[in-house]
Structures are given as structure tokens and as C-alpha cells.
From Swiss-Prot:
Domain PX stretches: 1-109
Name of the gene this protein is made from: Snx17
Name this polypeptide is given: Sorting nexin-17
Domain comment in the entry: The PX domain mediates specific binding to phosphatidylinositol 3-phosphate (PtdIns(P3)). Required for association with endosomes.
Region (FERM-like): 115-432
Tissues expressing this chain: Detected in brain neurons (at protein level). Broadly expressed, with highest levels in brain and placenta, and lowest levels in colon, intestine and liver.
Organism field: Mus musculus (Mouse)
Cellular component terms (Gene Ontology): cytoplasm; cytoplasmic vesicle; cytosol; early endosome; endosome; endosome membrane; Golgi apparatus; protein-containing complex
Signal peptide: none
Annotated binding of a 1,2-diacyl-sn-glycero-3-phospho-(1D-myo-inositol-3-phosphate), by residue: 36, 38, 62, 75
Length: 470
């Protein structure tokens, strides 16, 4: 998650109280909550009390007198760095103290009272699941409610996640982010005030070997099957005409497990596909479509002859990556503390081991750069868990009072319609040269922008390779 405080507001206190400065905390470029300095100071003091002064980052000091505009801007920058540092710390960023603070602040900012509501969650095939939740229910609460409605066993809930998406005209989903433990799904989706935004249930792991655990259960099997059919229909999974014929035959026989076994062998099975964007690979300002999955980022591009090509970047060959956000400065290049902020430009840049002795930066410019970074991190995390012999089955936080709420009337996962004929343009896919020798090293960033870069993400799954491995 990318935390930022891009702006401040001067607001009046309740009942005509004295004015104060509010700091707008954004997550992935969208307003999450609006807080006062005193609220963040209270959070800081609570974290220090629980974890010690040596663990918690430094906090901007109090001031005896009212702040000048320049001092407000300085404090904004310091608070932004503080929030980023806390979130990136594995201990502090996952703490209930930090996450509950953000949930309360989100609810207060949007002025949503705590009450029981109906929330619509979509499956990958567009099927609607209506669950009854509280407006103050956090992400895991809602996930458990959806699982209960579908009768998905408790031990399989950890294989799925809720995603905030924007539904496009063709019915496909543009992924905004995976809903996190610090937010309230009902508030997150309704605060966007657009019917385009939905919450979708989708599997949350990358390694198809984990499919075996999910497929043992009828509901889990149906969820994987519905997601796979949807991904094929939208062109996320690449199929030839012959493969499509085989899949349709298995679908007609309602052979769901065999259907999934065949789908697992197809290119881009289980990948997340992002909207079209721009990369500097294999040349500057190259239009590409990025997909994430199977421990790699895939870049598809169309050459002048309309031939599709693909370049694959394995996460084990990425030494590190970073997300950079920048905002064009007003004409004249000067920055005002209270200036309005333009549209944020996001870049994902990763340092890639092209050959044994050659590391090179590759940059992708996309509004979904943060989501791509999250995908990279989760793939690395999954690789490390598997390498250590661990399991992705997670222990679920239990509600006060014990067991999950189970609905009296479970909802079945509907079987999707038969596959339509494939798009012939999806068949011609040529791998780029594995040496990638045509790409030259270039830096990132621009002197004409006001940039705020998040910390570089080191990759613990990075492996050195030799030329014979390329």
C-alpha cells in the first residue's frame, strides 16, 4: 500500500470551534481519512507505549505557536514520511493499534454511523452475493460473511481475498487494490460514489499447486472454475483454438476438475491482468499490457506488423523495486504549500538481472503501479513461505463469542455459460529474446516533477543466475 498526505485543509471545529489543520491521508492515491495532528500524535504515543521508543520512527514535534504556511507544509511532509515508515515496518504496520486507528478515522471522515447494512460482493463470473454486515466491519469480517453465505469452509477462507475493482463496459474488472485490514469495505466502496466500483471475491495465491487444497471442496472447486472461465472469456488466459475446443468439451461434460487441470497448463493461468499502460521496454514509451502471476511480470506488446510479443520478468531475478509518485509542478516550477495537486503519475521500476553481470532498471508507468508492486511482494512472500516449508493457510481472527456467523440460507456458486469462440488475435504470441540485449540502461525520474518515492523494496527471493540460465 502506498500512503501519502498530498494535501492539507483548514477546517472549523465543531459548533463553531477554533480552526485547525486537517491532514488528508491517501491510500493508493485515494482519500482514506482526514485527521488532525493531535490524533496522529495520540497514535504515535500508543505505538511507543506498546513497542518502545527504539522501534517507532521519529514524530514531528509539537509547536507552541500557530504554524505558518511553510511550517504546515513541512509538517505535512514529515507526517507523510512517518505514516509510510510505520506502514512499511512489519511489526507496526500489521499491528491492531495502527489498523484500528485507520479504520476509525475512515469511518469518522466519511461520517458513516455504525449500523447493519446489505453489501453486494461479486464473484469472478459476475454472480452477486448479498451479505449482511455492519458498516464498521473490517475486511476479514466481510470475507468471513461471504464465505459463510457460500458455505466455504473456514480452513479455505485464507485462500481467497476481497478486491476493490472498477467494472468496465465489457464486464471485465480493472483492479484498484486488494482490500486491507486497515479499511472498512462498505465505507471504501460507497465513499467512491460510483456504481462502477465493486467488491470482488477472488483467489489470493499465485502457485497453482495450492489449487489442490481448494478443489477438494465443492464450493472451492466452483469458485476456481467460475474464475477460470471468466479469465478465459476476457482473454486473460491465452488459449489456442485447439485448447479452446478441449476446454469447451470438458465444460459441456461438466468435468470441472479436468477443465481446471487443462487450464493450469495454459499461459497466464491464475494471472492478474492490468489495464494498458506504458513501459520503457523494449523501447521508450512502449504501449504494453502487464500481467502478474506464476512468479513473474509479463509485458505484452504489439509490434508494427501487428504481431504480439511478450517479455517475462521473473521475480527471482528482480534485485529490488520501487514505486514513485510524482505531480507536475505549476508553470514556473515553484511549489506553494497550499497548492492544488494535479493528477498523480505513478511508476513501478524494478532492477532486473538481464545476464550474469548486468542489472538494468525497467520502468512501467501506470495508475495501477502500486497494485503491481503489491503483487510482486505477495509473490515473493509466497515463494519464501514455500521455501521455508510453511503453509499459506492462515489462522483466522475469531470474533468475540467464538464461531463465524453462518447464514441460514447458503448461496450456491452458479455454473458459468459455455465458452465462446476464441479471438484469433490472441493466438500469435512470440517470446522476446531471452537475452533482452536491445534494452539499454536508463534512469527514472524527471527534474520537472515534484516526486515522492516510497522506499525501495528489497527482494529476499532474488537469486543470482549465470548466462546458461537465461
Amino acid at each position: 500500500m502506498h500512503f501519502s498526505i498530498p494535501e492539507t485543509e483548514s477546517r472549523s471545529g465543531d459548533s463553531g470551534g477554533s480552526a485547525y489543520v486537517a491532514y488528508n491521508i491517501h491510500v493508493n492515491g485515494v482519500l482514506h481519512c482526514r485527521v488532525r495532528y493531535s490524533q496522529l500524535l495520540g497514535l504515535h504515543e500508543q505505538l511507543r507505549k506498546e513497542y518502545g521508543a527504539n522501534v517507532v520512527p521519529a514524530f514531528p514535534p509539537k509547536k507552541l505557536f500557530s504554524l505558518t504556511p511553510a511550517e504546515v507544509e513541512q509538517r505535512r511532509e514529515q507526517l507523510e514520511k512517518y505514516m509510510q515508515a510505520v506502514r512499511q515496518d512489519p511489526l507496526l504496520g500489521s499491528s491492531e493499534t495502527f489498523n484500528s486507528f485507520l479504520r476509525r478515522a475512515q469511518q469518522e471522515t466519511q461520517q458513516v454511523p455504525t449500523e447493519e447494512v446489505s453489501l453486494e460482493v461479486l464473484l469472478s463470473n459476475g454472480q452477486k452475493v448479498l451479505v449482511t454486515v455492519l458498516t464498521s466491519d473490517q475486511t476479514e469480517d466481510v470475507l468471513e460473511a461471504v464465505a459463510a453465505k457460500l458455505d466455504l469452509p473456514d480452513d479455505l477462507i485464507g485462500y481467497f481475498s476481497l478486491f476493490l475493482v472498477r467494472e468496465k463496459e465489457d464486464g471485465a474488472f480493472s483492479f484498484v487494490r486488494k482490500l486491507q485490514e486497515f479499511e472498512l469495505p462498505y465505507v471504501s466502496v460507497t465513499s467512491l460514489r460510483s456504481q462502477e466500483y465493486k467488491i470482488v471475491l477472488r483467489k489470493s495465491y499465485w502457485d497453482s499447486a495450492y489449487d489442490d487444497d481448494v478443489m477438494e471442496n465443492r464450493v472451492g472447486l466452483n469458485l476456481l472454475y467460475a474464475q477460470t472461465v471468466s479469465d478465459i472469456e476476457h482473454g486473460w488466459i491465452l488459449v489456442t483454438k485447439e485448447q479452446h475446443r478441449q476446454l469447451k468439451s470438458l465444460q459441456e461434460k461438466v468435468s470441472k476438475k479436468e477443465f481446471l487441470r487443462l487450464a493450469q497448463t495454459l499461459r497466464h493461468y491464475g494471472y492478474l491482468r492490468f489495464d494498458a499502460c506504458v513501459a520503457d521496454f523494449p523501447e521508450k514509451d512502449c504501449p504494453v499490457v502487464v500481467s502478474a502471476g506464476n512468479s513473474e511480470l509479463s509485458l505484452q506488446l504489439r509490434l508494427p506488423g501487428q504481431q504480439l510479443r511478450e517479455g517475462s520478468f521473473r521475480v527471482t531475478r528482480m534485485r529490488c523495486w520501487r514505486v514513485t509518485s510524482s505531480v507536475p509542478l505549476p508553470s514556473g516550477g515553484t511549489s506553494s504549500p497550499s497548492r492544488g495537486r494535479g493528477e498523480v503519475r505513478l511508476e513501478l521500476a524494478f532492477e532486473y538481472l538481464m545476464s550474469k553481470d548486468r542489472l538494468q532498471w525497467v520502468t512501467i508507468t501506470s495508475p495501477q503501479a502500486i497494485m503491481m508492486s503489491i503483487c510482486l511482494q505477495s509473490m515473493v512472500d509466497e515463494l519464501m513461505v514455500k521455501k521455508s516449508g510453511g503453509s499459506i493457510r492462515k489462522m483466522l481472527r475469531r470474533r468475540v463469542g467464538g464461531t463465524l456467523r453462518r447464514s441460514d440460507s447458503q448461496q450456491a456458486v452458479k455454473s458459468p455459460p459455455l465458452l465462446e469462440s476464441p479471438d484469433a488475435s490472441r493466438e500469435s504470441m512470440v517470446k522476446l529474446s531471452s537475452k533482452l540485449s536491445a534494452v539499454s540502461l536508463r534512469g527514472i525520474g524527471s527534474p520537472s516533477t515534484d516526486a515522492s518515492a516510497s522506499a525501495v523494496h528489497g527482494n529476499f527471493a532474488f537469486e543470482g543466475i549465470g548466462d546458461e540460465d537465461l
